[in-house]
Amino acid sequence: GSMLRLRLISGSQFPVIAGKFAFYFLVCLIQFVMMIAVGIFVMPLMGLNRLLLGGEPGAILLTASCVAMAATGYGLLIAVYFRTAQQALSFGSVSVVILSAIGGVWVPVYVMPEILQNISRFSPMSWGLESFNDLFLREATIASILPNIVRLLGFALVTVSASVIIHKTRTVV
């Protein structure tokens, strides 16, 4: 379809990848803002406590941006690696479920067996979740979450770079 036509145009494919990345990055940030808004405004309407944003607002935005970059990079890598949408959707769904389970999204890492606790240290979901927990619950600073921020940015850089390389090797022109 349209991707084939875009590939046939001579020139760099970078704007295509950058455009996709920018769009989905913004979608992630919009989702984050909507979830925060639900916690602040909707939860009290249901008789629940209002979400309190502890920590530094700049650190929360930085963490959300880094999580969005990591998630977008991962999605982009899956999209360019697999040949069909069905393959990408299947792998993406299963891998996200596995990464979230390992990363402590379903079950807190501290109740996992030691081997899984060690494995969870390699999950981007764990890095993001740990950073948000530290910011919201422990009023952490940017300095204290910096190791996870660097990991998330590194993951984003690796996945986006791999996406560009794979995309270039599959370019028709």
Predicted regions, residues:
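Transmembrane alpha-helix boundary/anchor motif
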Residues: 1, 33, 37, 73, ...
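Alpha-helical transmembrane segments and their short interhelical loops
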Residues: 13, 17-90, 97, 146-149, ...
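Membrane-interfacial helix-loop-helix junctions in multi-pass membrane proteins
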Residues: 50, 104-158
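Junction motif at the cytosolic side of a transmembrane helix
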Residues: 77, 81, 139, 151-173
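Central hydrophobic cores of alpha-helical transmembrane segments
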Residues: 91-95, 120-121
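Transmembrane helix-loop junction
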Residues: 40, 44, 79-80, 84, ...
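Aromatic-anchored segments of alpha-helical transmembrane domains
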Residues: 38, 98-104, 125
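Transmembrane helix boundary and interhelical loop/hinge segments in multi-pass membrane proteins
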Residues: 1-11, 172-173
